[in-house]
Swiss-Prot record:
Entry keyword set: DNA-binding, Nucleus
Domain (HTH psq-type) ranges: 1-52
Matching InterPro entries: CenT-Element_Derived (IPR050863), DDE_SF_endonuclease_dom (IPR004875), Homeodomain-like_sf (IPR009057), HTH_CenpB_DNA-bd_dom (IPR006600), HTH_Psq (IPR007889)
Entry GO CC: nucleus
Protein's organism: Homo sapiens (Human)
Region (Disordered) location: 527-549
Free-text tissue specificity from the UniProt record: Expressed in all tissues tested. Higher expression in testis and ovary.
Polar residues bias (residue ranges): 540-549
The gene coding this protein: TIGD7
A Pfam family this chain is assigned to: CENP-B_N
Top-rank lineage group of the source organism: Eukaryota
Protein name: Tigger transposable element-derived protein 7
Length: 549
């Protein structure tokens, strides 16, 4: 690149290139020479790296239009701008073309919602809005209203087949991922707990929702860590470093996937994990590393143009709208298998094996206490273990319809409704019916992303930047010690559990140490606390022991 004048301003695309050179370890002088910039401009770009990257990441197509845009400053009416752009992204993801007049009308509506009486969605505003978000004045690419869903499947198969041949992709390089809801604390209606405690009826429990994302390759040899979206940051009861958790956990107030969360996962997790798998497990040469990720068209997914690795060899492709149930591999028994396995583990932890002498009151009390103990940490680890146990053949079979037009073979041995009925009956849950079990097993089939209404978008923009929910309170050391004492008595009296004695004893000693430390700190704090003094002393004048003036 030719040298520029000293005060030449770089556009966003050029700034991104400068940042990539810095990341690659290029020297200050070589970057200055390539882009013709001064030392101060170089350091300004380096200092504003996060601002530049965040701005580009938020765009619908990161570098489309970036060659013209030079600033990352926001709009005067930021709330209106954010709301309109969120609305536009939803329409675009659904394949709905959006004209300029519709953007202006949406802006006027959101301005009224925010009480912006002086806002005008003028032609100038429209021009600036499109420029800010790199939205071209082009026709929409939505599917024709009258075309049936099935008619879209075959052209997609042909296009996919062509890409596979052109890119020379093998099954291990084809990936599919999909979102789903998980009502992690859900129990069947009419269970002991739901009849006993009015705070725990089936419908209430069902509101304990997480969103999950599963992704694997076509031969089932590479299953990526599942993403879990929860309502708040992980509680303090989950002591593990989040990087060591068996899932990727992200907080989101509405428990929905967003474009920002998905983009972050794609570039920080999917791309590097795929590279590592192909280089270290498949032993591919670096130049042979490539992958194609197939996704649904939903508001949580950015455009395919923006979901592309820097070298262009790891890409995304979207299924035609409304064809997910027909050809999306994850919906051909993979997600269902994972959920059935999860329900099994949940029952094992949540249900109580009742004694024959227990009456209905005792059964209800035990059931409620057990379900209350089942927490988000248990759900996360059980979900991760369930995903690990989904069979490779289950994933491979799920691609049969898409790739070979064959009906996939489902293997739900041990995961049918009757299998769950058996364990429920063993735990004394005789009042639940088979229909209750079916509703419970199939009750969380919704997607993990949502089309927001105008009110929902407004609410999200208003609440953006709000504080995360408070984390759960810490346990009392005295209560923990009491529980350990009780467990030690049980272990010492039960031969088959005596091997756990020293582990529990070690925990007990640590708790006692913490109790003593807590008391010492409390006493020191009391000793150091300033003593009250006479208020008159605070306003007393200087000493009069010296000479009088």
């Amino acid at each position: 690149m030719n040298k520029r004048g000293k005060y030449t301003t770089l556009n966003l695309e050029e700034k991104m290139k400068v940042l990539s050179r810095i990341e690659a370890g290029r020297s200050l002088k070589s970057v200055m020479d390539e882009f013709g910039i001064s030392k101060s401009t170089f350091y300004d770009i380096k200092k504003n790296k996060k601002l530049i990257l965040d701005f580009v990441l938020k765009q619908d197509m990161p570098l489309v239009g970036a060659e013209k845009r030079k600033r990352t400053t926001g709009a005067k009416y930021g709330d209106v701008d954010d709301a309109v752009y969120m609305w536009y992204q939803q329409k675009r993801s659904a394949g709905v073309p959006v004209r300029g007049v519709e953007l202006q009308a949406a802006a006027e509506r959101f301005a009224r919602c925010f009480g912006r009486t002086d806002f005008k969605a003028s032609t100038g505003w429209l021009f600036r809005f499109r420029n800010r978000h790199a939205i071209g004045n082009r026709k929409g690419c939505g599917e024709q209203v009258l075309s049936s869903v099935s008619e879209n499947v075959e052209p997609f198969r042909q296009k996919l087949s062509m890409i596979i041949k052109e890119e020379k992709l093998c099954l291990a390089q084809l990936y599919s991922g999909d979102e789903t809801d998980l009502f992690w604390k859900s129990m069947p209606e009419n269970s002991q707990a739901s009849r006993k405690d009015i705070c725990l009826p089936g419908k209430k429990i069902n509101k304990e929702r997480l969103s999950a994302f599963l992704c694997a390759n076509a031969d089932g040899t590479h299953k990526l860590k599942s993403i879990i979206i929860g309502k708040s940051k992980l509680p303090k009861s989950v002591k593990e470093d989040t990087s060591t958790l068996p899932v990727i956990y992200k907080p989101s107030k509405d428990v929905w996937f967003t474009r920002e969360l998905f983009s972050e996962w794609f570039f920080q997790n999917f791309v590097p994990e795929v590279r590592h798998f192909q280089l270290n497990v498949l032993r591919f040469h670096d130049e042979d590393v490539r992958a194609l990720l197939l996704l649904d068209s939903c508001p949580a997914h950015p455009s395919s143009e923006s979901l592309t690795s820097e070298d262009g060899r790891i890409k995304c492709m979207f299924f035609p709208h409304n064809t997910s149930t027909l050809i999306q591999p994850m919906n051909q028994g993979v997600i269902l298998s994972c959920k059935r396995l999860y329900r099994w583990k949940q029952l094992e932890e949540s249900l109580v094996i009742f004694e024959e002498s227990d009456d209905e009151q005792e059964k209800g009390d035990k059931g409620v206490s057990k379900i209350k103990i089942y927490n988000i940490k248990s759900a996360i680890f059980n979900w991760a273990k369930s995903w690990e146990e989904v069979k490779q053949i289950t994933i491979a079979n799920a691609w049969e319809n898409l790739l070979y037009k064959k009906e996939p073979e489902y293997d739900f041995q041990g995961l049918e409704h009757g299998d769950y009925r058996e364990i429920l009956e063993k735990c004394g849950e005789l009042e639940t019916k088979l229909d209750d079990d079916r509703v419970w097993l199939n009750g969380d089939e919704e997607k993990g992303c949502l089309l927001k209404t105008k009110g929902g978008i407004t609410k999200e923009v208003v609440q953006k930047g709000g504080e995360a929910e408070k984390q759960t309170a810490e346990f009392k050391l005295s209560a923990v010690r009491e529980s350990l004492d009780y467990l030690l008595d049980f272990v010492d009296a039960t031969p088959e559990f005596q091997r756990f004695h020293f582990t529990l004893k070690e925990m007990q000693q640590e708790i006692v140490k913490k109790q003593f430390q807590s008391k010492i700190h409390s006493r020191i704090g009391s000793f150091l606390k300033p003593r009250p003094h006479n208020i008159k002393d605070s306003f007393s004048g200087p000493s009069t022991s010296g000479s009088n003036h």
